[in-house]
Amino acid sequence: MCKGITRREFLRISIICIVLFLILGTGLAKPQVTYGQTTNLRFSTWHVPVGYEVKTVWTPMLEELKKKSKDRINYTMFAGGALGKGPEHFDIVSKGLSDIGYFTATWTPGRFPLTDVLSLAAWVDGKDIATDIGNAMYKRILNQEFPGVKMVELNGCIQAFMWTKKPVRTLEDVKGLRIRSPGGHQTNYIKALGAEPIFMPLGDVYLAMETGTIDGIVTCPPLIMSFKLHEVAKHAVVTTFGCVSEGVIMNQDSWKKTPDDLKPVVDEVCHNPFHTTGGLTRDVYKKMMKEVTDKKVELYNLPAKEAERWYDRFRDVTRKWVADLEGKGLKAKEVVRAYNEECEKRGVKVAAFPPEWK
């Protein structure tokens, strides 16, 4: 027996050591699970406060979180440029300026190279469908591009059209036009058609079209309405240019701090916010297109033969994009094939998919 320690003290210390060893050794020492706490989520998006997205998707989604959590989740909305410009929104969340928010991957070229597959030219007429496809692609392959954040949902967008000041009917009409591009594949599609892609913030497009600095824009119908571009772009070619790759992410530390019993609520409500809220779904898209025509915008559907001329060029863009990425060691063709599979499962046609890759 050690000098100065009684037999009873020795036994007590021994028992404590054995218990600690069993707890640590069997992995029973886990972080304390948090229940019953409340949290306030700072939500950020570049979408304008009065636009379709904020009014019909983000605010209703956050209200649903509040309701489902029985008021234990509250929120603060930061819309438009409140926290930063559009391309900054991934970092706004990842660096903790906000807790959760919407970002556009296409606006940071080269950062999420494979995720650009979601912006290939495809006939997607609802963001609910785009999100189902994006989430499936994230699970299959794209998760590798987003370390360090909690991916809430990943999506492409509703198909973009070309909106112009003057009528466009053929490839020849497009040649030489200056067209605002959102970036990514759309930039290369515009080039492939013989036009000049111009990149500028959406908020600057109205004046640029009004003054003739640009001749048109490639974007989706919701943004035409949100930014009132229907007032300056009175003609649209209804043929898919695809659109941008986007999603909702959550700051990793904010996710860890979220009470454990509220995490399933966040997943349930936000994994497909368009399903949850009914905003920007296929049904809404149909109504939105009627709103566009009610604003006296002429929608021109390309005849099948002319559309194929455009799509042949889009497919060449896909082939080159894949070749460039595979030259860097990325399995781009595999990703494109997977995307086409996920689209076909949901009745979506990828116009830019090279048929020989089936």
Question: What residue ranges belong to the model's regions?
Answer:
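Signature of the catalytic double-stranded beta-helix
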Residues: D132-Q144
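N-terminal secretory/targeting leader peptides
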Residues: C2-I23, P31-I129, Q144-K358
